[in-house]
Curated annotation (Swiss-Prot):
Gene symbol of the encoding locus: aphA1
Protein name: Aminoglycoside 3'-phosphotransferase
Family membership: Belongs to the aminoglycoside phosphotransferase family.
Taxonomy of the source species: Bacteria, Pseudomonadati, Pseudomonadota, Gammaproteobacteria, Enterobacterales
Organism: Escherichia coli
Disulfide bonds: none
Molecular function as annotated in GO: ATP binding; kanamycin kinase activity
């Protein structure tokens, strides 16, 4: 994400009337990094007031914002997350207002302090093990491959998959080819844990050298642990193959399952 401006200053958007009173006096910036389909704003600069984030979704994206609110409520018992300040749902829109976790994303920290890469990866691995150790029986959300494949197929059939955003290994592939090659990697035995669903460097927040929380939890649910490992491994590839290798070592996997890894990377292309 280093090639784009991460946010852009903007004017206050038109808001649901129930939010108006709380948000006067803030400066506004629109996020350019998130790929959820929702519009995300950072609210800052109001004297004696906390920094906030506001996420807005319309249509089907409103359902995604609602999913995130529900998962934030549940996961906060186990992991450090933003706090919900306000949630509004109408037939067409959803608004989710949360506190901001102070600090910088793991991506930003790796860019600014490349010599700290090993320490950063170690912290990521420990945090991920903590998430994956939450008892599956406590999780009410399903995100297994059957569920995700159904979502992926629906997105493909409705023309919602952006082939121009595929990883370099699949650059120029039609969506149908990714679908076909992905299915060649099935079946495999699932190793189900509670997953984040989009465990990328931009969704993990560091402050003063410590990993203090995660954001964008709308895909949290029970799935194979490689759902998270694959996405994080892929992100680390932007920095160094040695960091990719270290991730598995510190997580506790001596021999990574490359079949599962590739399956989940292909699956992620549909979202």
């Amino acid at each position: 994400m280093s090639h784009i401006q991460r946010e852009t200053s903007c004017s206050r958007p038109r808001l649901n009337s129930n939010l108006d009173a709380d948000l006067y006096g803030y400066k506004w910036a629109r996020d350019n990094v998130g790929q959820s389909g929702a519009t995300i704003y950072r609210l800052y600069g109001k004297p004696d007031a906390p920094e906030l984030f506001l996420k807005h979704g319309k249509g089907s994206v409103a359902n995604d914002v609602t999913d995130e609110m529900v998962r934030l409520n549940w996961l906060t018992e186990f992991m450090p997350l933003p706090t919900i300040k306000h949630f509004i749902r109408t037939p067409d829109d959803a608004w989710l207002l949360t506190t901001a976790i102070p600090g910088k994303t793991a991506f930003q920290v790796l860019e600014e302090y490349p010599d700290s890469g090993e320490n950063i990866v170690d912290a990521l691995a420990v945090f991920l093990r903590r998430l994956h150790s939450i008892p599956v029986c406590n999780c009410p959300f399903n995100s297994d491959r059957v569920f995700r494949l159904a979502q992926a197929q629906s997105r493909m059939n409705n023309g919602l998959v952006d082939a121009s955003d595929f990883d370099d290994e699949r650059n120029g592939w039609p969506v149908e080819q990714v679908w076909k090659e992905m299915h060649k990697l099935l079946p495999f035995s699932p190793d189900s844990v509670v997953t984040h669903g989009d465990f990328s460097l931009d969704n993990l927040i560091f402050d003063e050298g410590k990993l203090i929380g995660c954001i964008d939890v709308g895909r949290v649910g029970i799935a194979d642990r490689y759902q998270d490992l694959a996405i994080l491994w892929n992100c680390l590839g932007e920095f160094s193959p040695s960091l990719q290798k270290r991730l598995f070592q510190k997580y506790g996997i001596d021999n990574p399952d490359m079949n599962k890894l590739q399956f989940h990377l292909m699956l992620d292309e549909f979202f």
